[in-house]
Curated annotation (Swiss-Prot):
Its EC number is 2.4.1.250. The gene is mshA. The keyword Phosphoprotein does not apply. It catalyses: 1D-myo-inositol 3-phosphate + UDP-N-acetyl-alpha-D-glucosamine = 1D-myo-inositol 2-acetamido-2-deoxy-alpha-D-glucopyranoside 3-phosphate + UDP + H(+). Keywords: Glycosyltransferase, Magnesium, Metal-binding, Transferase. This is D-inositol 3-phosphate glycosyltransferase. Homodimer. One of its GO terms (biological process) is mycothiol biosynthetic process. It comes from Stackebrandtia nassauensis (strain DSM 44728 / CIP 108903 / NRRL B-16338 / NBRC 102104 / LLR-40K-21). The keyword Secreted does not apply. It is an enzyme of class 2 (transferase).
Length: 443
């Protein structure tokens, strides 16, 4: 394992020159960007792909997204908005395949991507941008076939996940580690959300620092905005005077919603006067190991004697999710690891402070002491104490709420798209100056 000098990393994460292509192929094999985040395999990556595609299209760049078909009702292709096409590529049965089974369908999926491009005039795509390692494997071959640069965004990394496993979680397989190492080595450019993710790619995956660009994600300012807290609570059936904590995400061990449930139970024991007013709102659906027992979090709340204080809501789209954030006094993000933690940013854009685990990208998404609090570890008592200090101190919450708005305003999808255009343009120029050899010629 090689650690790059800090000067090399600083050059690698410098802002890119703003140039770009005419048409971009994006690959999101395992999940469609049109799926509802918060359940199954849909999450922040889905939001990232769709939002960046929209902003690129606004800048006159055509974006075509390739994802695996999961239903016979899906058309071969559709256009969710002007300048964007989503292709549903048949690869294996529509049902019965988990994300862990999808490596067996890489050949079929890649073939579908290549066939779609072959029906177009030569030089149809200028760049291919893959999201997640499975997509990276498919895009690697497509980029070589088309003679275009391959830009890769990992979103999550096996080596990092395995370093931060929840007790009930399953380690990522060695095959994924190998696949990620290959994609990192063969990509023309690597886009990361934070400088810490860039360092991980260099330190753990031996990425070339000169290929790494930091491009933070954004938040939609037309959706996630401050609003009437009392009106939001009444629409959700929450008491006006409640102290409301929120969680939004997939219900799985990695996201650690159980930490919040246990912390609420502990807080009620530490401060009995708060018990009648405390509420926890959980937005999300089962995923990963959590899908084996979809009601495990309900069962935990009942076991701890706080079922009456926890409201479970199904995953919901942007405007409805924003309303939940507005209803909350504090939003918790206790994940064992996050490449960024988009939910934290969206909550802050609604003027709600965030208490988050001090891991991964959450240390960038949350400004500790300014827009929220970062907690080291996942001990329920530590979380209960931190929450107690916030819910019982309205002036401090108000200061953090103002800081949350200030911090979130620094992250926009427009900035993300501009940075991506720069990364694409630089990769196009590098390949034009020094065309890459095929993998076969390297051996």
């Amino acid at each position: 394992m090689r650690t790059a000098p800090r000067s090399q990393l600083n050059r690698a994460i410098a802002p890119c020159r703003k140039r770009g292509p005419r048409r971009v192929a994006m690959v999101s094999m395992h999940t469609s960007p049109l799926e509802q985040p918060g359940t199954g395999d849909a999450g922040g990556m889905n939001v990232y792909v769709l939002q960046t595609a929209r902003r690129l299209a606004d800048r006159g760049v055509a974006v075509e997204i390739f994802t695996r078909a999961t239903s016979s009702e899906q058309p071969p292709a559709l256009s969710p908005s002007e300048g964007i096409t989503v292709h549903y590529v048949p690869a294996g049965p529509f049902e019965g395949l988990s994300k862990g089974d999808l490596p067996s369908q890489l050949c079929a999926f890649t073939n579908g991507v290549l066939r779609a491009e072959a029906a177009q005039p030569p030089g149809y795509f200028d760049v291919i941008h893959s999201h997640y390692w499975l997509s990276g494997q498919a895009a690697w071959l497509a980029a070589e076939r088309w003679g275009v640069p391959h830009i890769h965004s990992a979103h999550t990394l096996a080596k990092v996940k395995n370093l931060h496993l929840a007790a009930e979680d399953t380690p990522e397989p060695f095959t994924r580690v190998v696949g990620e190492e290959q994609v990192v080595a063969e990509s023309d450019a690597l886009v990361t959300n934070t400088s810490s993710e860039a360092e991980v790619l260099v330190d753990l995956y031996r990425a070339d620092p000169d290929k790494v660009t930091v491009t933070p994600p954004g938040v939609d300012p037309e959706v996630f905005t401050p609003g009437d807290k009392l009106a939001a609570r009444r629409r959700l059936g929450l008491p006006d005077d409640a102290l409301v904590l929120g969680f939004a995400g997939r219900i799985q061990p990695l996201k650690a919603p159980d930490v919040l449930v246990r912390a609420v139970a502990r807080l009620r024991a530490l401060n009995p006067e708060l018990a009648p007013r405390l509420r926890l709102v959980v937005v999300g659906g089962p995923s990963g190991n959590g899908a084996d027992n979809p009601r495990w979090l309900h069962d935990l709340a009942a076991e701890l004697g706080i079922a009456d204080a926890v409201t479970f809501l199904k995953p919901r789209a942007g405007h409805e999710l924003a309303e939940v954030f507005r209803a909350c006094d504090v939003v918790g993000v206790p994940s064992y690891n996050e490449t960024f933690g988009l939910v934290a940013l969206e909550a802050q854009a609604c003027g709600t402070p965030v208490v988050a685990a001090a891991v991964g990208g959450l240390t960038t998404a949350v400004a500790d002491g300014h827009s929220g609090l970062l907690i080291r570890g996942h001990d329920e008592t530590d979380w209960a104490n931190a929450l107690d200090k916030l819910v019982t101190d309205a002036p401090r919450r108000a200061r953090l709420a103002a800081g949350a708005l200030d911090h979130a305003a620094r992250f926009t999808w427009s900035h993300t798209a501009d940075d991506l255009l720069g990364a694409y343009g630089d990769a196009i120029q590098r390949r034009a100056v020094s065309p890459r050899r095929s993998p076969a010629s390297k051996r």
